[in-house]
């Protein structure tokens, strides 16, 4: 998707879960991006493989005591750990700590009894899929010699607090994109960001509905 934004011609790419489901898929996606060297790319990425479904199980185990939420989360962690170990020969790569921190925060939430609505908890947990996948792809792209910036979409795509079906605040989002995204393209050619999620003014995470990654790509093209 090609569009013109604030004097910058850029392409928006969207990679779904199947496109980054394992190390081989990530390598293929990165090879595609490397083919556009010198062009401005905004890359929207979904959670890896069936991670969204797996994280939904974590939420249900936690909220309805259907199973052990920590065990279910560990399965998600192990899946991503295997992908990272296949992509990065050096275990000192910062991506390992960054991804681990996301899981640690989730474990902390699971340690407490539910204090919020199901939809709120859903968004805080299920959104990890996109945050983690983009960290991994961004780090691998950097390792392959393609400088890029990992953008936390929650800082620029502002929504209301209708959890699981959040509505975009177009005025705020456009202002933040102008302020934060456009200047980045003066430093690098590639921005990696998340589909499916947004943020509230209270710094909570929201999701945009089950096919939200496609929606995110369209939002950036519109803005």
What is each PLM-predicted segment?
Residues 3-223:
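Nucleotide/pyrophosphate-binding catalytic subdomain
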